[in-house]
Protein backbone atom coordinates (compact mmCIF):
# COMPACT_ATOMS: atom_id res chain seq x y z
CA UNK A 1 0.00 0.00 0.00
CA UNK A 2 2.70 2.48 1.01
CA UNK A 3 4.78 1.82 -2.12
CA UNK A 4 1.75 2.04 -4.41
CA UNK A 5 0.65 5.34 -2.89
CA UNK A 6 4.15 6.76 -3.29
CA UNK A 7 4.33 5.67 -6.93
CA UNK A 8 0.89 7.08 -7.67
CA UNK A 9 2.13 10.50 -6.61
CA UNK A 10 4.83 10.58 -9.30
CA UNK A 11 3.85 12.42 -12.46
CA UNK A 12 6.28 12.44 -15.39
CA UNK A 13 6.09 11.60 -19.10
CA UNK A 14 8.99 9.24 -18.43
CA UNK A 15 7.45 7.27 -15.54
CA UNK A 16 4.89 4.51 -16.01
CA UNK A 17 1.62 5.79 -14.59
CA UNK A 18 0.12 4.15 -11.50
CA UNK A 19 -3.64 4.70 -11.47
CA UNK A 20 -4.92 2.70 -8.53
CA UNK A 21 -4.17 -0.01 -6.04
CA UNK A 22 -6.27 -2.44 -4.08
CA UNK A 23 -6.55 -5.78 -2.37
CA UNK A 24 -8.33 -8.89 -3.60
CA UNK A 25 -8.45 -11.37 -0.75
CA UNK A 26 -4.86 -11.72 0.43
CA UNK A 27 -3.40 -10.29 -2.78
CA UNK A 28 -2.49 -6.64 -3.25
CA UNK A 29 -2.51 -5.27 -6.79
CA UNK A 30 -1.49 -2.11 -8.62
CA UNK A 31 -3.30 -0.73 -11.67
CA UNK A 32 -0.64 0.65 -14.03
CA UNK A 33 -0.46 2.32 -17.41
CA UNK A 34 -0.53 -0.11 -20.34
CA UNK A 35 2.43 0.35 -22.66
CA UNK A 36 3.44 -0.92 -26.06
CA UNK A 37 7.12 -1.37 -26.69
CA UNK A 38 10.08 -3.42 -25.56
CA UNK A 39 12.40 -3.20 -22.59
CA UNK A 40 15.78 -1.59 -23.12
CA UNK A 41 17.67 -4.78 -22.24
CA UNK A 42 16.02 -6.65 -25.11
CA UNK A 43 16.84 -3.78 -27.44
CA UNK A 44 20.52 -3.86 -26.51
CA UNK A 45 20.62 -7.64 -26.96
CA UNK A 46 19.04 -7.31 -30.41
CA UNK A 47 20.93 -4.29 -31.74
CA UNK A 48 24.11 -4.05 -29.66
CA UNK A 49 25.67 -0.70 -28.77
CA UNK A 50 23.52 2.34 -29.45
CA UNK A 51 24.45 5.61 -31.14
CA UNK A 52 26.03 8.02 -28.61
CA UNK A 53 23.28 10.60 -29.10
CA UNK A 54 20.64 7.94 -28.44
CA UNK A 55 22.49 6.91 -25.29
CA UNK A 56 22.41 10.52 -24.09
CA UNK A 57 18.72 10.89 -24.97
CA UNK A 58 17.83 7.79 -22.97
CA UNK A 59 19.98 8.98 -20.08
CA UNK A 60 18.36 12.41 -20.12
CA UNK A 61 14.85 10.98 -20.00
CA UNK A 62 15.71 8.57 -17.18
CA UNK A 63 17.31 11.49 -15.32
CA UNK A 64 14.09 13.46 -15.71
CA UNK A 65 12.11 10.57 -14.22
CA UNK A 66 14.54 10.20 -11.32
CA UNK A 67 14.42 13.93 -10.64
CA UNK A 68 10.68 13.71 -10.02
CA UNK A 69 11.10 10.70 -7.73
CA UNK A 70 14.01 12.17 -5.79
CA UNK A 71 12.09 15.39 -5.13
CA UNK A 72 9.49 13.16 -3.46
CA UNK A 73 12.33 11.58 -1.41
CA UNK A 74 11.89 8.31 -3.28
CA UNK A 75 14.92 6.26 -4.35
CA UNK A 76 14.15 3.77 -7.10
CA UNK A 77 16.98 1.37 -6.07
CA UNK A 78 16.60 -0.90 -9.10
CA UNK A 79 17.41 1.15 -12.20
CA UNK A 80 18.38 -1.31 -14.94
CA UNK A 81 17.56 -1.80 -18.66
CA UNK A 82 14.94 -4.41 -17.80
CA UNK A 83 13.01 -1.66 -15.99
CA UNK A 84 13.19 0.81 -18.88
CA UNK A 85 10.45 0.50 -21.51
CA UNK A 86 11.28 1.83 -24.99
CA UNK A 87 8.10 3.03 -26.70
CA UNK A 88 7.42 2.87 -30.45
CA UNK A 89 8.21 6.60 -30.76
CA UNK A 90 11.67 6.06 -29.24
CA UNK A 91 10.94 7.67 -25.88
CA UNK A 92 11.26 5.72 -22.64
CA UNK A 93 9.29 5.04 -19.48
CA UNK A 94 10.86 4.00 -16.18
CA UNK A 95 9.01 1.07 -14.65
CA UNK A 96 8.79 -0.60 -11.24
CA UNK A 97 8.33 2.51 -9.13
CA UNK A 98 6.41 1.25 -6.13
CA UNK A 99 6.78 -2.49 -6.61
CA UNK A 100 10.49 -3.20 -6.17
CA UNK A 101 10.09 -3.78 -2.44
CA UNK A 102 6.93 -5.82 -2.97
CA UNK A 103 8.82 -8.11 -5.31
CA UNK A 104 11.50 -8.72 -2.69
CA UNK A 105 9.31 -8.66 0.39
CA UNK A 106 10.22 -12.26 1.20
CA UNK A 107 13.81 -11.16 1.81
CA UNK A 108 14.95 -9.27 4.90
CA UNK A 109 15.59 -5.60 4.15
CA UNK A 110 17.58 -4.71 7.28
CA UNK A 111 20.68 -6.89 6.96
CA UNK A 112 20.65 -7.74 3.27
CA UNK A 113 21.39 -5.63 0.24
CA UNK A 114 18.86 -6.26 -2.50
CA UNK A 115 19.22 -5.31 -6.12
CA UNK A 116 20.49 -6.50 -9.45
CA UNK A 117 24.22 -6.93 -9.05
CA UNK A 118 25.19 -5.68 -12.51
CA UNK A 119 23.65 -2.27 -11.78
CA UNK A 120 23.85 -1.87 -8.00
CA UNK A 121 25.89 0.98 -6.53
CA UNK A 122 28.88 0.26 -4.29
CA UNK A 123 27.12 1.77 -1.27
CA UNK A 124 24.04 -0.36 -1.89
CA UNK A 125 26.26 -3.44 -2.01
CA UNK A 126 27.84 -2.37 1.28
CA UNK A 127 24.47 -1.84 2.93
CA UNK A 128 25.02 1.86 3.49
CA UNK A 129 22.41 4.61 3.41
CA UNK A 130 21.16 5.34 -0.09
CA UNK A 131 20.50 8.70 -1.65
CA UNK A 132 19.90 10.05 -5.15
CA UNK A 133 23.51 9.39 -6.14
CA UNK A 134 22.89 5.65 -5.82
CA UNK A 135 20.31 5.81 -8.61
CA UNK A 136 22.70 8.01 -10.60
CA UNK A 137 25.37 5.29 -10.36
CA UNK A 138 22.92 2.70 -11.66
CA UNK A 139 21.92 5.02 -14.49
CA UNK A 140 25.60 5.37 -15.36
CA UNK A 141 25.83 1.59 -15.67
CA UNK A 142 22.75 1.59 -17.91
CA UNK A 143 24.30 4.24 -20.18
CA UNK A 144 27.59 2.30 -20.20
CA UNK A 145 25.76 -0.79 -21.40
CA UNK A 146 23.86 1.21 -24.02
CA UNK A 147 27.12 2.71 -25.30
CA UNK A 148 29.15 -0.51 -25.38
CA UNK A 149 26.62 -3.32 -25.67
CA UNK A 150 27.84 -4.94 -22.46
CA UNK A 151 27.79 -4.40 -18.71
CA UNK A 152 30.93 -2.96 -17.11
CA UNK A 153 31.29 -5.76 -14.57
CA UNK A 154 30.41 -9.42 -14.95
CA UNK A 155 31.11 -12.62 -13.06
CA UNK A 156 30.02 -16.15 -12.26
CA UNK A 157 27.54 -15.08 -9.60
CA UNK A 158 25.94 -12.06 -7.99
CA UNK A 159 28.51 -11.84 -5.19
CA UNK A 160 31.50 -11.65 -7.55
CA UNK A 161 29.78 -8.98 -9.65
CA UNK A 162 28.85 -6.95 -6.57
CA UNK A 163 32.43 -7.04 -5.32
CA UNK A 164 33.64 -5.71 -8.65
CA UNK A 165 31.22 -2.80 -8.27
CA UNK A 166 33.04 -1.93 -5.04
CA UNK A 167 36.62 -2.80 -5.89
CA UNK A 168 37.25 -2.43 -9.64
CA UNK A 169 37.22 0.41 -12.14
CA UNK A 170 35.28 0.01 -15.39
CA UNK A 171 37.07 -0.19 -18.71
CA UNK A 172 36.55 3.18 -20.43
CA UNK A 173 33.66 2.78 -22.90
CA UNK A 174 35.75 4.12 -25.81
CA UNK A 175 38.12 1.17 -25.42
CA UNK A 176 35.19 -1.14 -26.15
CA UNK A 177 33.36 1.01 -28.70
CA UNK A 178 35.53 3.55 -30.52
CA UNK A 179 32.37 5.45 -31.46
CA UNK A 180 31.99 6.70 -27.89
CA UNK A 181 33.38 10.24 -27.76
CA UNK A 182 35.31 11.75 -24.87
CA UNK A 183 32.44 13.91 -23.59
CA UNK A 184 29.95 11.05 -23.32
CA UNK A 185 32.61 8.84 -21.77
CA UNK A 186 33.35 11.40 -19.04
CA UNK A 187 29.63 11.77 -18.30
CA UNK A 188 29.15 8.02 -17.95
CA UNK A 189 32.23 7.51 -15.81
CA UNK A 190 31.37 10.44 -13.54
CA UNK A 191 28.03 8.75 -12.84
CA UNK A 192 29.96 5.58 -11.95
CA UNK A 193 32.46 7.08 -9.52
CA UNK A 194 32.93 4.80 -6.51
CA UNK A 195 32.66 7.71 -4.09
CA UNK A 196 29.12 9.17 -4.23
CA UNK A 197 30.55 12.63 -3.56
CA UNK A 198 32.36 12.52 -6.91
CA UNK A 199 29.24 11.74 -8.98
CA UNK A 200 26.63 14.14 -10.28
CA UNK A 201 24.83 15.11 -7.09
CA UNK A 202 21.34 15.41 -8.53
CA UNK A 203 19.43 13.93 -11.43
CA UNK A 204 18.73 17.48 -12.63
CA UNK A 205 22.44 18.21 -12.82
CA UNK A 206 23.01 15.08 -14.89
CA UNK A 207 20.05 15.84 -17.15
CA UNK A 208 21.34 19.35 -17.85
CA UNK A 209 24.78 18.03 -18.79
CA UNK A 210 23.28 15.39 -21.08
CA UNK A 211 21.05 17.99 -22.73
CA UNK A 212 24.10 20.20 -23.32
CA UNK A 213 25.83 17.24 -24.94
CA UNK A 214 22.79 16.57 -27.13
CA UNK A 215 22.65 20.19 -28.28
CA UNK A 216 26.35 20.27 -29.11
CA UNK A 217 27.25 22.72 -26.34
CA UNK A 218 30.45 22.42 -24.34
CA UNK A 219 30.35 19.78 -21.62
CA UNK A 220 32.39 20.64 -18.53
CA UNK A 221 32.92 17.30 -16.80
CA UNK A 222 36.14 16.45 -15.00
CA UNK A 223 38.28 13.45 -15.86
CA UNK A 224 37.20 10.32 -13.96
CA UNK A 225 39.11 8.78 -11.09
CA UNK A 226 41.47 6.13 -12.44
CA UNK A 227 43.17 5.06 -9.20
CA UNK A 228 41.70 2.59 -6.79
CA UNK A 229 43.10 1.01 -3.64
CA UNK A 230 43.61 -2.69 -3.09
CA UNK A 231 40.68 -4.70 -1.81
CA UNK A 232 40.20 -8.05 -0.19
CA UNK A 233 38.70 -10.98 -2.02
CA UNK A 234 35.39 -12.66 -1.24
CA UNK A 235 36.55 -14.39 1.88
CA UNK A 236 38.40 -11.42 3.33
CA UNK A 237 37.13 -8.72 5.64
CA UNK A 238 39.28 -5.94 4.20
CA UNK A 239 37.76 -3.62 1.61
CA UNK A 240 39.07 -0.39 0.15
CA UNK A 241 38.04 2.82 1.86
CA UNK A 242 36.19 5.50 -0.13
CA UNK A 243 37.25 8.91 1.17
CA UNK A 244 36.06 9.01 4.79
CA UNK A 245 33.19 6.58 4.29
CA UNK A 246 32.70 3.77 6.75
CA UNK A 247 34.39 0.48 5.93
CA UNK A 248 31.95 -2.37 5.43
CA UNK A 249 32.21 -6.02 4.68
CA UNK A 250 30.50 -7.81 1.83
CA UNK A 251 30.07 -11.53 2.22
CA UNK A 252 27.64 -14.25 1.14
CA UNK A 253 24.60 -14.76 3.32
CA UNK A 254 25.05 -17.86 5.44
CA UNK A 255 22.17 -20.26 5.54
CA UNK A 256 20.95 -23.65 4.49
CA UNK A 257 22.83 -23.47 1.21
CA UNK A 258 26.02 -22.14 2.77
CA UNK A 259 28.17 -20.20 0.33
CA UNK A 260 25.63 -20.62 -2.46
CA UNK A 261 22.76 -18.94 -0.64
CA UNK A 262 23.05 -15.74 -2.67
CA UNK A 263 22.88 -17.70 -5.89
CA UNK A 264 19.94 -19.89 -4.96
CA UNK A 265 17.85 -17.29 -3.15
CA UNK A 266 16.99 -15.34 -6.26
CA UNK A 267 17.13 -15.74 -10.01
CA UNK A 268 19.64 -14.31 -12.47
CA UNK A 269 22.06 -11.78 -11.07
CA UNK A 270 19.74 -10.44 -8.42
CA UNK A 271 21.56 -11.18 -5.21
CA UNK A 272 21.19 -11.00 -1.46
CA UNK A 273 24.30 -9.80 0.34
CA UNK A 274 24.87 -9.74 4.07
CA UNK A 275 26.54 -6.56 5.24
CA UNK A 276 26.94 -4.52 8.34
CA UNK A 277 23.52 -3.20 9.35
CA UNK A 278 22.99 0.28 7.87
CA UNK A 279 21.74 3.30 9.70
CA UNK A 280 18.17 4.37 9.16
CA UNK A 281 17.52 6.11 5.84
CA UNK A 282 15.50 9.29 5.55
CA UNK A 283 14.65 8.58 1.94
CA UNK A 284 11.95 6.14 0.95
CA UNK A 285 13.43 3.23 -0.94
CA UNK A 286 11.06 1.39 -3.26
What are these regions (language model features)?
Residues 1-9:
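AlphaC helix of the eukaryotic protein kinase fold
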Residues 21:
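Activation-segment/catalytic-loop signature of the eukaryotic protein kinase fold
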Residues 25-39, 43, 47:
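Conserved short submotifs of the Hanks-type protein kinase catalytic core
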Residues 58-59:
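Activation segment signature within eukaryotic-like protein kinase domains
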Residues 62-74:
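Protein kinase catalytic-loop region centered on the HRD/HxD motif
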Residues 118-221:
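C-terminal lobe helix-coil module of Hanks-type protein kinase domains
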Residues 197, 201-270:
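Juxtacatalytic C-terminal regulatory tail of Ser/Thr protein kinases
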Amino acid sequence: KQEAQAAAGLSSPYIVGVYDWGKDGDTYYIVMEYLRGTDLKSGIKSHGALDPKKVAQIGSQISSALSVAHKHEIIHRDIKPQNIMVLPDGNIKVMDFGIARAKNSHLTQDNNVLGTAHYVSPEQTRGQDLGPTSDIYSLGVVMYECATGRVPFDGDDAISVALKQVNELPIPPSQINSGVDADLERIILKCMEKDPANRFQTADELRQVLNSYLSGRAVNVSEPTRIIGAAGDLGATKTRELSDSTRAMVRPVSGVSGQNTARSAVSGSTGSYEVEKPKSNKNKII
